[in-house]
Structures are given as structure tokens and as C-alpha cells.
């Protein structure tokens, strides 16, 4: 069985590298963080006799990830590695998928649910790139309890209610004033059983509200925007930062 949290099923279209073919800034900060991670020495407790030599070899052969990603700006063979969307049928065991709206990987939850043909369930909460029991912004959920039930059913053969309810449990956010940190997200939980049945609805903007019919009257709206307006925006893919 599988539990995946904050994941992608397509490394080219859903990851932090390219969106719609456009290069994302995240290539550079994440690539450099990985550079720092890979520079760390091997734990002496694990390799007491060879930790130094293996650490030096790692430094000598270490790739520069931003360079690798920039060398593959279109979908090619490079991105197939780790992209289960290439063939969802390769997965033949139950899957529990979890992510949050404040993370950057939420598109992968509905695409994975639609692509799989195995027992599956999903959560999408209001959270950033964190585990759901830490849930920021709140409300958090009992991820550890649900994970235990998932493992109990599929690894230990214990009958329980882990598949009861909708296939996907999703946090439907209400409109909120912009803040640099949202400690609590306003909204409610809803259930989705079939993502392919979700349809788009076209709404037309008019003065003060959205309407279902196009407004043919000319309107003028004057905005006085503060120069620091962008400072109030939330961070995309907040990696453990509350809100």
C-alpha cells in the first residue's frame, strides 16, 4: 500500500520546474537547497570506516540540479523518471494521497485519483507543504490516525472504515482578506467521488459582484493600490511556514 504526501504524478507539468512551459523561480531556490543538502557528510555511525572517502566522492560527482533542469525545458525522457502519469496502471496497490491548497502540488491529487484503477482515497486540506496533523493553516486533521488505519487494512488485514465516505475529502475555502499569514482557513469540508464530473462554470465580472450573464454596459472601476500590496500575498508552496 502507498501513502503519498505533497507529491507529483507528473514531474514536468506538476512539479516546481515548469508551469505551462514557463520556467519557475523555484528551480533555483530548491536546486540550491538540494546542493546544500548533498554537501553534508555521511553519518559516521552508518559508515564508520568509509564515511570520509564516500563523502569526498559525493562532492566530486555531485550534480548541479538547476543546470540539469534547465537542460530539459520541454517534456522529454528526463521527466518520465518518477512520473507515474506515464502509466498509472503500473500502480497495482491501494493509494492514499494527501496535499493542501497552500502547497504547489494540489493538481496531482485529482489527476492521480482519476488515473488509478485501485482502491484509493484522498485529502486536500488548506495546508502548506506539511503533514496534515501539523496542518497550517488550520484546521488540521488526524493524519497519524488515518495513516494507521490505512496500514492496518492493507498491510495487516484488519477490517476498518478507512474507505468509507467520499473518495476525496476536500477543503472548500471561503473568501478571505489577504494576509501574509492565515493561521486559520475559513471554509468547510466537501466530498468528491468522481473528479471527471467536475465542470467549469463561466462567471462574468461586473461592478461589485460576479454574474452568470455578460454585462454589456460599460463600467469604470478605479483602484488605488498600495505599492507594497504584494507583501500581503501568501507564499506558494509554504514549506512548513504557518499559513
Place the predicted regions along the sequence by residue:
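C-terminal, loop-rich substrate-recognition/catalytic regions characterized by aromatic stacking residues
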Residues: 138-243
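Conserved alpha/beta-hydrolase "acid-adjacent" motif
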Residues: 103-110
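Catalytic histidine-centered segment of alpha/beta-hydrolase-like enzymes
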Residues: 128-140
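Short secondary-structure boundary/capping segments
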Residues: 17-23, 111-116, 137-143
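Accessory cap/linker subdomain of secreted extracellular hydrolases
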Residues: 1-90
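Catalytic histidine neighborhood in serine/cysteine hydrolases
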Residues: 117-131
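Short beta-strand/loop motif that positions the catalytic acidic residue
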Residues: 91, 97-99
